[in-house]
Amino acid sequence: MKLEHHLSLLLLLLFILTLRSLTPTSAACHVDDETGLLAFKSGITADPSNMLTSWKKGTDCCTWSGVQCDNNRVTQLSVTGQLDKPNSFLSGTISPSLSKLTFLSGIYLQNLRNLTGPFPAFLFHLPNLKYVYIENSKLSGRIPASVGNLTQLEALSFYFNRFTGPIPSSISKLTQLTQLKLGGNILTGSIPNGIKNLNKLTFLTLERNGLSGPIPDFFASFPELRILRLFRNKFTGKIPASISALAPKLIYLELGHNALTGQIPAFLGNFKTLDTLDLGHNMLTGTVPTTLANLTKIFNLDLSNNQLMDPFPQLNVKGIESLDLSYNKFHLKEIPKWVTSSPIIYSLKLANCGIKMKLEDWKPAQTYYYDYIDLSWNQITGSPIGLLNKTDYLVGFWASGNKLKFNLESLRIVQTLKHLDVSRNLVFGKVPKAVIGLDRLNVSYNHLCGQLPATKFPASAFLGNDCLCGSPLAACKKA
């Protein structure tokens, strides 16, 4: 009996051990990863929205907010703020101890706004790193030539920081990159010719810097490129012919706010997948090529502030969200029919486009979703009341320098409206109290009369009217 009893106990013990071996255990993350992450947290001096509140010593760091693990090693770190929430940011520096996260493949520190310091050298000690997105912060100094040692990277983004100096030529060694995003810094000099070696690129965004010189003619090297953003720099010369090689796949072509010269290339009509074409604020001349009629999928077109001339081609768009042809040498005479028939449009800017029509004759397919309308400096007559009183989301209406005649008190000022400029027209009536909700107002040089309501706007917003009075203008005369 004793032998049977001992045998039974032994079998029970073996059964329990077997069960325990089959039951998964919840091992904590590696101590090096925990140490590195806590060092990062200690470098943060302000975390008003408590993004790192779950990061506590002694708890499993694989369960912390923004941390992703594989086999108990941290592989991704994603701490992201929300730009629409003022308190969603982190202040402080990025601890070099993140180099302890040797299994890290992706680091995403985005929209944190107040992280400071130089180029993060810890990146050079992470052999598995493939994705770097440190965006919308205040990192500064130069991007070091040693960035070329990060040859395993597939994405590199320091979008909207404060880096200065040139783009290092060594970046040409990062041949695995599919995304290179350095927009929104203070970079200077020319685009390194060696970037042509990065033939896997799908995104190349260098906008909002101080880059100069001609745009390199090397775009045949990028068969996969979908987004090219070079706007708001100091580029000169003509639009490179090799951009034509991007026609099969390019979706965004943004070259605006530079000093480009020459004509708009006819080959742009081959970009059948193009969503956005921005050539505004350059020094382009000649006529708009008729081949642009082939851009049936275009949703955003900006050719403003150039020296382009008539005739403007009839476009075959299925719907356009944003159009800006302002300040060229066009004489459109009327708002184009392909604009009028567009089933959806948010922003229409046709300032100084030689439009001569009665506004009531413009009957757009929809007005409900208009955000911005700029018809300034044309020869438009009539009244905008019927048009504007049908909009519910209007943010800005500019129509200065026309011959519009209407009673300002009849205008329905929707809650979303922030900018109203109807200066230098034939507007009459009184200034309604509702204008107090606007951010900017200009009704100068019209035929308005009466006492001004309480206002935050300067006198220049009301000058040149028949008989307006009251602060900030002269006091009204007592009857």
Segments from the language model and where they lie:
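Plant-biased, solvent-exposed loop and capping regions
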Residues: 1-479
